[in-house]
Amino acid sequence: FVPWGAHEMRGNYKTRWKYLYYVFYQQKLKYKKFKSFFLATVLAIINPFLYKNMRLIPTYQDIRFTKSLRESLSYLDDGIPILVFPEDSSEGYDEIIVKFNEGVVVLADYVDKHRDIDIPIYPVYYSKRKRVIEIGKKASYRTLKDKGHTRAEIADILRRHVNKLYENIKLRKLKEKR
């Protein structure tokens, strides 16, 4: 698979460092300044090599997003799946996801329009604390669209699928403790 990621991570050292320090470590992960500084300084050096080898597709919040869609389509044409983290993590990462961004739905719509393909969307939940990954049943963009759902509604349906996976993990862990 090829992941989507913040375009800042494909920028120069200063751009990567600022994103890691201010946004990723402090805003999203809630790390203290020293830990954020140390990690941002080290990882801003290493990340270009990691992301180049991962073939990270940079995502944007503006018109350049069409570039992300075109690049994604070329990988899909080659049979390579795209990994999207659609949760809104602007306030940090929570176990129960409050909001999904619509990018994954926009991608599904783009592929549908340009290739007439209903790409499967698999909801996935990873619990770092419980060290478990749960993969749900595939969702069909066309089916949801044909039912009259908007992009925002489809994103929310997918979010609820992912949160259900989290609930499954919790229930399974409770049963294991008994």
Predicted regions and their residues:
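Catalytic core of membrane glycerolipid acyltransferases/transacylases, capturing the structured
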Residues: 1-61
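Non-catalytic C-terminal accessory region of glycerolipid acyltransferases
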Residues: 61-178
